[in-house]
Amino acid sequence: MKVIAVTGYKPFELGIFKNDHPGVECIKKALHRKLITFVEDGLEWVIISGQLGVELWAAEVVFEMQVEYPDLKLAVFTPFLEQEENWKEDNREYYEFILSQADHVDSITKRKYESPEQFKLKNQFFIEKSDALLAVYDEEKPGSPKYIVESAKKKGEIENYHSYFILFSDLQDIIEEEQWNNAE
């Protein structure tokens, strides 16, 4: 596997409203654990759409990993131009920082938002251009990643395409592990 698409919930879907929320570190730790095994097996590119939440946290994880794995690259393919246009200023600044550090940035539709069709095109692009999908996603709480996860599963039924998931139970395990380590 050379290219993996990473996605997951938006912050509000997780009840997270600031990047210094303790849940963010837990999610980043889970992403790191998954990505490190893929990197050691030859992963070269992580691709995201630049969506707030899991995707931008994954970008931070990639940046941290690049210290030890300088060949690991991050690409941000936005579904449309200026997706951050209506975001709060601190979110825009955070997003622009991620874009400034990414190895490749492009827009899939190359135009501003017009319709939900642009999100479908984004999902198709990600599934076509990646070898696998990694999602912070639990089927018991579908949310925004539902459509790309469904597309990935369909591709997996007809081709050698894998979907990997970080479930809420995985995040709970990390929280308990941290509590155990801090109690010692």
Curated annotation (Swiss-Prot):
Transmembrane segments: none
First and last residue of the signal peptide: none
Annotated SUPFAM superfamilies: MCP/YpsA-like (SSF102405)
Family membership noted in the UniProt record: Belongs to the UPF0398 family.
Domain of life: Bacteria
Pfam families per record: YpsA (PF06908)
Native source species: Bacillus cereus (strain ATCC 14579 / DSM 31 / CCUG 7414 / JCM 2152 / NBRC 15305 / NCIMB 9373 / NCTC 2599 / NRRL B-3711)
Classification of source organism: Bacteria, Bacillati, Bacillota, Bacilli, Bacillales
Record protein name field: UPF0398 protein BC_1561
